[in-house]
Each structure stands twice: as C-alpha cells, then as structure tokens.
Amino acid sequence: QALRQLVRNFTDPRVGCVSGLYRLGDPHDLRGQGEGLYWRYETFIKRQESRLHSILGAHGALYAIRKSLFQPLTETSINDDYLIPMRIVEQGYRSVYEPAAVAWEREVASVEGEFARRRRIAAGNCQQTVELLRMLSPLRGGVAVSFFSHKVLRTVAPLFMVALLISSVWGPTPWAAAALILQAMLYGSAAVGYLCQRRGWTVRWLSAPL
C-alpha cells in the first residue's frame, strides 16, 4: 500500500523523487518520546517545503526516485538519502512528500547508538552544506530558501550556541544573566535525561532536550 501511495506522485512529470512519512520508536520510551517530538517537527517542515517546491532529502526508510535521474555517489558520501534527492532537485525536478505512505521503525537504539547516529548525521550535514552551496542561488527560488533555513542554519547552529553561551557568561546585563540561566537549564536537563535513560528511568519532560 505504501508503494502505491509513493508511485502515484510520478504521474506528474515534474516529480523526480517522493518521500514517505517516517515514524520511529515506542511512545512510552524516553528516547521514543524525544524522537517523536523531533519527527513531528520534521514532518511539519517537510509538508511546508513540499508545498513551496521540494523537500530537502528524503526518509531513508521509504522513498522512490525516477531511475533515469539517479547519479552515483562517491565512497565518502554521508547520508545518501539526502544527497540522492537533492541531486534530482538540481536537475530541475521536484522532490515531494507523501504522508499517506508510512514506514514504521518500532525499535529505538540505545542512547549511545542514538548519539552515534546523530553524530553521523551532523557530519553529513556539514559535508552536504559545503557540497551543495550552489543551491543557495536566487535562481533556485523556494529551494534556496528551504536550503538556507533548514540546512545551512541548522549546520551552523552549534557555533551560534557556543557564541551565545560565551557572551552570556561575560555579558554584564540582566538579559545576559537570564540567557545564561535558561541555557544552563536546557543543557542540564539534557544531561539529566541522558543519565536517567542509562539507568532505565523514564522522565517524560526530559525527552525533548535529550
């Protein structure tokens, strides 16, 4: 059924890639709660990107492309489920979202495994941002807007967070002190959530920062 939902989008000759909806984890598990919140956010973003022009990347668990548009990747490429769809978009085709096609992954990795996965994704984000900077061309229209807001800003966000932390420590104003307290609460919650997960404890409100 999911495959039928995917391929129906290819009746539009402008569509070169279709991504399905990805659902992950046990909602009763701490990691699943945090991941569920993250994927709900990602789903909203992808819906809007698809309406604007094209989504950035695809869910590796379930997506389809036109065979004629595939371009081989190098051995050093990370996150092929992002690069393959983006190269199709580069060729002038759309990459769209099909929420009626659903892929479920019920098991969530350990905290250590999840951290390793996200570290790999972050490394891929850096690689892809550099490799696809040409997508920022104004000639790309909505794709350029999506690429800047969804990929470039996300890649450099850790640098902004470090700069914010440093400026909050050295800033003499009440606003800087308030920002420092909020950051300490956020990072502290993530650390406590990590420790709770290692001990097998579930604390729902700690799932988001983790």
Where are the language model's segments positioned?
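Short alpha-helix within the catalytic core of nucleotide-sugar-dependent glycosyltransferases
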Residues: 1-11
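Catalytic donor/gating beta->alpha subdomain of glycosyltransferases that bind UDP-sugars
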Residues: 10-41, 76-80, 84-150, 208
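Loop-to-transmembrane-helix entry motif
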Residues: 48, 52, 151, 155-159
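Conserved nucleotide-sugar donor-binding
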Residues: 57-72, 93
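Short, well-ordered alpha-helical scaffold segment located
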Residues: 68-70, 102, 152
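Membrane-embedded multi-pass helical conduit in multi-pass membrane proteins
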Residues: 105, 154-210
